[in-house]
Amino acid sequence: MTKKYDPDAVIIMGSDDIITKEIINFYVEKINSGHLLVGMKDFYIYESYLKKLAHWRGYGKLNDAHRMDETIGLGRCLARPLLDKIEFDVWGGLELRRNLDGAMTNRLKEVGIFPVSEKNCPVVGYGGKILRVGHVGYKLNEMNGFAIDIKSKTNVTSFDRYLNRDPESVTFKEGGILEEYIYKDTIEKIMTLDGQE
């Protein structure tokens, strides 16, 4: 479906995800410099039922060592050459309700796109262009941006799952940080969700 719009790149977003324009601008710069896949390594989570806000620092050594350089699923940005290579099918034809991020990472590995740091990202010449062939992630502070996943009672990945896997990876925050990045009317709508979608 997305292919009909002839995009230069696609950002993977859920209906309960918000990212700021700073992240989009950062992605545009990276895609224009030849990166095939960029994304975030950390994000904020708001649990609407419990009214709790937290920062998740990303995959860590404790329970996710095998995913250390992998980006989170929210906000992954895939460039057109990569989309063409995978025929615009990020999940490889699988009908999934869970583990979407890991399934996408595995699909990308099938075509040679592995999680790497920017400094270790392979660079190749292709069709007269320089391409950076890796799954490269950045921290929100490197992008001067903000990303949040609004959790309800029905989310695929619950708030508690982050806490249970690695309690040290979650830092609870005061709600004031939202006001730095999100419009007031949007914050008000988020606060009234009360666990509903």
Label each region the model flagged:
Residues 5-8, 33:
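Active-site acidic short loop of glycosyltransferases
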Residues 94-197:
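C-terminal catalytic/acceptor-binding lobe
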Residues 20-97, 106:
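Conserved catalytic core of nucleotide-sugar-dependent glycosyltransferases
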Residues 12, 37-40, 116-118, 139:
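A structural signal for short, well-ordered beta-strand segments and their strand-loop junctions
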